[in-house]
């Protein structure tokens, strides 16, 4: 059974990528027999190069993606060096799951409603400046992409913090800090000169994922990014949506260019990391041993901004009349909720079906692969984890869409479900990898020595211990599925609509109230499942059940016996 699950995982995650790669390469060379293009050429590449603003879009993409990643990594390190192994770190860990639960699109809509020229932030400033008209400066769709950079950095910092948990525990940071402080280094100097050179290489894969996402993001860039020019990923997406199907080679060339761009930037980052850590090492030994780095209150800011979006979305969804610079709507109404209620039910049902199916299948695959690793000592190839997280979604899905067009029949629903499984699986696997590695195998070995079968030992001993992690990983898979925009749009071909696809399309419209309604519902669903997973994991904790079954004692003194129970 484990072998079958392992093979199925490799098949589902790798096999469809072959026709996808072939589809995008053939399209880029203008070979699309379905459209009557039977002579390969490079017209698509020439059309892409000749498009006005394509070079500026590439430059903007590199600037926003790289800057957002560097900002997120810097904030993550500053938070770690100030909060790790302190009383405040427990609060940081507790808030990570709710922060990760909020989808990027819902956060982007709330960010836009807060930092727009007539948003809540500028309304608050107007109370003191008495400005009667909205401000001209804004962080939403600004020409330099600063709003997009800030939003991406805020959203990706919790992910890097979560990935740092297992890394720092493996590094035994407490021992490193104790040894460094015995040599005269204070806390900040020890973190910068001793911990950082070891932490950064171990965080390479999560940083790659954040960097690739920042370079290729479409949905958040459509809401918060500049439009003249837009980022290159948004430009390729616009080319793909061109009603003239003969322009598909241009979009395919853009998808390949986006892939090459991501690969090039990741390679440059790897080179710079190598030089900083392994070649240019003077900064690790020279300089002052006592200095202080900021970061004490950074996590509060990272946590407050996303949760500030919830009341912003809530108020906007009920606002009927809200003139600038009023801090509160003059009239409230449920009109927009009533207007969209029927659509919301249908879209929420579609999102739930896709999320439940993809998260459950991804969870089964992840558990199967981890058990296969424990039993046969053969890990899942890193390529299976890396492809969905590091390669731009446009570059993968475009070719698969072309391949689907060449198949007889309707394959939109299975293809969409497959795409959701593909992109949810790495996050579910990574969420379970740490608990599986930390599980003490001697527990199941003891159960086997007492006569239980391997299956019964797993269900009765191991499952109760790892069940909280399984529930949280399942919630992570649901959250990832709820956030998928491009897989649903590309492979669903407009036949499958979800809360995310509708929220993105409405966010570019003029009615902020309807956008707030969809953004609020999209943020609410993952929070519900994360809350359910947290509550269920507490009840499923075996320590809780053991404590509940233990006999009650009247006083704490009964736990300490001064005399033996037998009579002398």
List each language-model region with its residue ranges.
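Amphipathic alpha-helical segments in well-structured domains
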Residues: 42, 55, 92-95, 176, ...
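A short amphipathic helical element positioned immediately N-terminal to and/or at the very start
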Residues: 40-50, 332-341
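Short helix-to-coil transition segments within interhelical loops
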Residues: 86, 169-173, 178-199, 439, ...
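Membrane-water interface segments at the C-terminal ends of transmembrane alpha-helices
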Residues: 2-33, 49-169, 198, 202-219, ...
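Membrane-interface capping segments at transmembrane-helix boundaries
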Residues: 171-174, 270-279, 439-442, 534-547
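Flexible interhelical linker loops that connect adjacent transmembrane helices
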Residues: 272-301
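Glycine-rich helix-loop "coupling/hinge" segments at transmembrane-helix boundaries
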Residues: 34, 38, 219-246, 325-330, ...
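Short, highly charged, low-complexity non-transmembrane loops/tails of multi-pass membrane proteins
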Residues: 181, 281-284, 448-450, 544-559
